[in-house]
């Protein structure tokens, strides 16, 4: 969870907080490489929540451009990563959504680390969408109301999440000192380990990343047992 771009810019003395977003965007490619270096084969980057879409039009336009640039960078042939979009692209301007889809399509056959780009994403909405899709399929198959109710099970819902077919996250990292999930992968992170740091995202270093990995490796995961 790449948080703290604006606060970093203000505390660094920049009058234009957009500088924080730009520096933070450059950090994403670095972080993906760090993950690849320690054999992490799947990472999800929370770039824009549904709530973020309520920000000013000026800031949103900047964010849209930056996010599209991130997608373009990840889609470069030398990265060999596989981009997957999770969220509501229909909430984005068409040109931005188009660039994101092109990045996803261009990397579909790559063999490197998988990178989920969470854009226009909301954890609650993801669950709602999954249940609605499950019920719609059941309705189309002619299931009765009782059968539809019976069809709503944990595994069935998981099958229709944006991240269907992927494992749940082992570790969630959030920068900037905020200690909450803010809607991030609410279903999938039920038993994820969570690591918080006061460091703002633009200042997040490889050593910080490795500390998170080391801390995670020393935890005993019981999955509620």
Curated annotation (Swiss-Prot):
The keyword Phosphoprotein does not apply. One of its GO terms (cellular component) is plasma membrane. SUPFAM superfamilies: Undecaprenyl diphosphate synthase (SSF64005). The keyword NAD does not apply. It is an enzyme of class 2 (transferase). The gene is uppS1. PANTHER family: DEHYDRODOLICHYL DIPHOSPHATE SYNTHASE COMPLEX SUBUNIT DHDDS, DEHYDRODOLICHYL DIPHOSPHATE SYNTHASE FAMILY MEMBER. Mg(2+) binds at residues 3, 193. Gene3D superfamilies: Decaprenyl diphosphate synthase-like. GO terms for molecular function: ditrans,polycis-polyprenyl diphosphate synthase [(2E,6E)-farnesyl diphosphate specific] activity; magnesium ion binding; Z-farnesyl diphosphate synthase activity. This is Isoprenyl transferase 1. Homodimer. Its EC number is 2.5.1.-. Belongs to the UPP synthase family. Its cofactor is Mg(2+). Binds 2 magnesium ions per subunit. Substrate binds at residues 4-8, 21, 49-51, 55, 174, 180-182.
